[in-house]
Amino acid sequence: MFSPGQEEHCAPNKEPVKYGELVVLGYNGALPNGDRGRRKSRFALYKRPKANGVKPSTVHVISTPQASKAISCKGQHSISYTLSRNQTVVVEYTHDKDTDMFQVGRSTESPIDFVVTDTISGSQNTDEAQITQSTISRFACRIVCDRNEPYTARIFAAGFDSSKNIFLGEKAAKWKNPDGHMDGLTTNGVLVMHPRGGFTEESQPGVWREISVCGDVYTLRETRSAQQRGKLVESETNVLQDGSLIDLCGATLLWRTADGLFHTPTQKHIEALRQEINAARPQCPVGLNTLAFPSINRKEVVEEKQPWAYLSCGHVHGYHNWGHRSDTEANERECPMCRTVGPYVPLWLGCEAGFYVDAGPPTHAFTPCGHVCSEKSAKYWSQIPLPHGTHAFHAACPFCATQLVGEQNCIKLIFQGPID
């Protein structure tokens, strides 16, 4: 379920060097149909046996398509900026022995290290629930890591295709900077948000920015694919921090550094917390039957002993089929303990350890999905505005991508028995 070596946090300097991990928001530890090859919910970036990074070198200004094609066919990496039918700027890239490059995108072609497809909220991302038209770029972005300490990771919009080229056509937003070098934006953009205070219990949301093809930082465009770029933010960089969020317009990724993962609870810790709750034998206050969180191996079917909760008040019960207040709102129930009316849902333990900002007990549930995690983690994600569509932002559950609702977006759970 997790990347090799995740549990071996005790030796962060052990070879091979891990730069960090990318975790896709909306999945609770694995893809619904299982992690396969380069398509998975979590991807570890390790130092490569041999550097594969590239850096800009020669710039060509070309007036004919044939000349442009001749340069792009030389076998070197290049970025082409088409200014008009009669003018293209081609920037050649040469080998960089000091960096490793990792590429992310929707394409399954070999240059892509981590294949990402559109996330469907509620984790209904199955073969039956296909996106009709993806908004994620086939070659969405690239992450370049320094091979020497402190192993800095930087993000750039767009990735090189199978011909080692990046093409920015006539309609793409592109420009020449005052220092003379060309730059541009991809169609739907690559957005990044660095949390203030790192990825800890005290973290606060940062500001969403757009990253250019050359790695500069800009304010957001008016809409996702607008022609006019935002304003250059000279005080910020494209260096990824622990907890940085990367949005590819269809999927959002969380970047965790190797050091950050070293201080993150492991799957074993979350399993121990689950067993601790179950060992306390919480009871349904009405039926007095014992409740138990199901095993971490994710199941679609709700189990008989699974705890349910009224999300308006937080009271935890076993399942019962009464308390409906109306036929139109099938999920609205009246809590028998306090008479509060609201959603009544099964509770699922949040199993993806990378989303936790602390190692606290699972005491809070997101509304309306019922995923449970620590108080600090629930409150952190409840205040993070995640991009949705082409210009909207809203908070969402990191474990299933469901849009959050309610006053606080999460609720403290009230268990009957010795837990509280």
Curated annotation (Swiss-Prot):
One GO molecular-function entry: ubiquitin protein ligase activity
UniProt pathway annotation: Protein modification; protein ubiquitination
Any Pfam family: Pellino_RING
Keywords of the record: Phosphoprotein, Transferase, Ubl conjugation pathway
Variant or mutagenesis effect after changing R106A: Abolishes binding to IRAK1
Family as reported in the entry's similarity comment: Belongs to the pellino family.
Protein name: E3 ubiquitin-protein ligase pellino homolog 2
Native source organism of the sequence: Homo sapiens
